[in-house]
């Protein structure tokens, strides 16, 4: 599991278990382990319906989280805006996570979601690995939208390379 890859505990669940019951078990386990952070990840949705929104609202009421982040696929375009509006109307969102920013889409969904929700984009996902979750830098997204590339991301990648590797290249 992803939790195992990053060395985090996780709570297994079954399909017949209610989300609120899973969340209660997770809260108890987090308290028992004296955890500082508990992440509850709900299933991604392509369509929004009343039953699903009622379920997510009940879950939110059970957990009473400090942060409620809406994760949006940067490649979904107008659908992202519609889904963001529905979630923003139903929940007190505190921020946005823009996923799949390494794809072909330039990031127009980010502008729509930010405008509709009024919430800040806090993180962006580049690739599918946990190392690809980064703080959001508006100037980098603006460069991509304008077709100028993302030099900041390139530079930060280069900065991660160990100096001894570069020494061998230029020796």
Residue ranges and their predicted role:
Residues 1-15, 21-24, 109:
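P-loop NTPase switch/communication element
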Residues 53:
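Active-site-adjacent beta->alpha loops and helix N-cap segments on the catalytic face
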Residues 15-16, 73:
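A generic secondary-structure micro-motif detector
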Residues 23-27, 31, 35, 47, ...:
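Conserved phosphate-handling catalytic cores of large alpha/beta enzymes
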């Amino acid at each position: 599991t992803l939790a195992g890859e990053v060395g985090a505990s996780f709570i297994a669940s079954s399909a017949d278990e209610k989300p609120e019951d899973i969340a209660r078990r997770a809260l108890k386990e987090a308290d028992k382990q004296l955890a500082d952070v508990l992440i509850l990840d709900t299933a991604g949705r392509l369509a929004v319906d009343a039953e699903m929104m009622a379920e997510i609202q009940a879950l939110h009421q059970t957990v009473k989280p400090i942060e409620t982040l809406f994760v949006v696929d940067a490649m979904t375009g107008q659908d992202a805006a519609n889904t963001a509006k529905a979630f923003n109307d139903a929940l007190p969102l505190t921020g946005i996570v823009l996923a799949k920013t390494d794809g072909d889409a330039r990031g127009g969904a980010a502008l729509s979601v930010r405008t509709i929700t009024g919430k800040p984009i806090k993180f962006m996902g580049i690739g599918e690995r946990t190392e690809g979750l980064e703080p959001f830098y508006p100037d980098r997204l603006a460069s991509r939208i304008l077709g100028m590339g993302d030099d900041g991301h390139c530079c930060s990648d280069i900065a991660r390379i160990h100096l001894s590797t570069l020494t061998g290249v230029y020796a």
